[in-house]
Regions:
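General structural signal for secondary-structure boundaries
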Residues: 13, 22, 228-230
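Hydrophobic, aromatic-enriched alpha-helical segments typical of multi-pass transmembrane helices
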Residues: 34-234
Length: 235
């Protein structure tokens, strides 16, 4: 018996039965509302859609990048003189960092945040400029070197801020990952300045700030690991 039938005919023939039917349907509606409001039903769709293979591989790449950055940074601090061969060693952690950003983007790509997507592509373009500029420095090609600094460095900083804000909005990764992306380059500059008394700043061949970048990449790896653990707990 439907409420429509009660409204049209039932009220005149069987009013008590119609009242019971209304109460029954109201109870069903309340039960459905409770089910939707329960924590189990409110699992965010982003968690369910996380591609596990991207997160798992991203953890490994992020930790590897962190180790490379820290090793490069410590070597620059222990041996503070300018060593141009470090410009070539820099390629390894930087490429791994680009790859880490790719995996960070992939695990939250299902959310469809325009800022996150735009920030990621912006960072990738800036990274290519930085790579080209670093090769220009190593090969002593000034035209190529200007692509890395100032253009590549400035765009990379701005892109990371946008990427971090988009990651914050996506709500897939922990908040500290978004903050790490936003502050990665400003803290890198600050680290280099603070370490200048023990590891002087050089035009090239000095990467003492690699220690900061390594710690940031380790935090990103921890964030990727956290969403995998959270996904297992919710399963």
């Amino acid at each position: 018996m439907s409420l429509k039938w009660c409204d049209s005919l039932g009220d005149s023939l069987m009013p008590s039965l119609c009242v019971r039917q209304e109460n029954r349907e109201a109870k069903i509606a309340r039960v459905n509302m409770k089910a939707v409001a329960s924590p189990q039903a409110q699992k965010t769709p982003t968690i369910a859609k996380i591609p596990v293979r991207w997160a798992r591989t991203g953890i490994f790449v992020a930790y590897t990048a962190a180790g490379c950055w820290i090793a490069l940074g410590l070597e620059s601090i222990i041996r503070p003189e300018q060593e141009n061969y470090r410009d070539w060693l820099w390629l390894a952690p930087f490429l791994l960092t680009m790859l880490t950003f790719y995996f960070v983007h992939m695990v939250q790509s299902g959310v469809g945040q325009n800022m996150e997507r735009a920030g990621f592509y912006f960072v990738m373009v800036a990274s290519v400029l930085a790579l080209t500029g670093n090769l220009g420095v190593s090969l002593e090609q000034r035209t190529l070197a200007t692509l890395g600094f100032p253009w590549g460095a400035v765009l990379w900083t701005v892109g990371l801020m946008g990427f971090g804000l988009g990651t914050w909005q996506a709500k897939v990764l922990p908040r500290y990952v978004a903050l790490t992306l936003i502050l990665l380059e400003p803290l890198s500059i600050l680290t280099g300045v603070l370490l200048a008394p023990v590891s002087p700043l050089h035009p090239r061949g000095g990467y003492s700030a690699g220690v900061e970048k390594g710690l940031c990449l380790a935090l990103i790896g921890m964030g990727l690991r956290a969403i995998m653990t959270r996904d297992k707990d919710d399963a």
